[in-house]
Amino acid sequence: MSKQKHSASSTRWLKEHFDDKYVNEAKKKGYRSRAIFKIEEIQNKDKLLKAGMTVVDLGAAPGGWSQFAAKVVGEGGRVIACDLLPMESIAGVSFLQGDFREEAVLNALLDRIQPDMVDVVMSDMAPNMAGNLSVDQPRAMYLVELALDMCRQVLAPNGSFVVKVFQGEGFDDYVKAVRDLFKVVKIRKPDSSRSRSREVFIVATGYKG
């Protein structure tokens, strides 16, 4: 029985993953994923999260961003997380598993948020990549449009939004749409984001409501 060969790209990814200082640091500190360092760096620069805030985390699993947000907002705050994938419980985080494009799931998510409005909407959502840019980019842009639509539904005036976006077709139009809704918009590329990745993070503050 022959061993299944890894593709060159998957072999490279595996090597990068296990050599990655952020992966190793996350394990050492008991963090859910290396993604926590991205939101930590954004927080250090932009101070989006504060004690007592209500936060929605879209595409939350395995929970790195929720874990970080819960620590910052503290017992007086709330983190409501949603993902298609399961996520182990985190203290201070209310997790809903499901697809919020479905009415029943969206209503359940809104029920957990209301009657409050949300101070910060976070989205680290990404599609399952097919390795074909013409397929992957529209899927990725569709998800970030959903995240922006969530802002329109639940974000309080002067609230903030942080979203992972992949540069490519539709990116410039999306940035313009975010600028139409927020007073200040910045584009961040955290040190912990792999240099060859097309991902950047749009950080938007001062929701115009």
Curated annotation (Swiss-Prot):
Protein name stated in the entry: Ribosomal RNA large subunit methyltransferase E
Active-site residue list: K164 (proton acceptor)
Alphabetic keyword roster: Cytoplasm, Methyltransferase, rRNA processing, S-adenosyl-L-methionine, Transferase
Annotated localization: Cytoplasm
Biological function: Specifically methylates the uridine in position 2552 of 23S rRNA at the 2'-O position of the ribose in the fully assembled 50S ribosomal subunit.
Binding annotation for S-adenosyl-L-methionine: G63, W65, D83, D99, D124
GO cellular component, one term: cytoplasm
Family assignment from sequence similarity: Belongs to the class I-like SAM-binding methyltransferase superfamily. RNA methyltransferase RlmE family.
Record GO terms (molecular function): rRNA (uridine-2'-O-)-methyltransferase activity
Reactions it catalyzes: uridine(2552) in 23S rRNA + S-adenosyl-L-methionine = 2'-O-methyluridine(2552) in 23S rRNA + S-adenosyl-L-homocysteine + H(+)
HAMAP family: RNA_methyltr_E
GO biological process, one term: RNA methylation
Highest taxon of source: Bacteria
E.C. number(s) listed in UniProt: 2.1.1.166
One Pfam family per UniProt: FtsJ
Enzyme class: transferase
Native organism: Vibrio cholerae serotype O1 (strain ATCC 39315 / El Tor Inaba N16961)
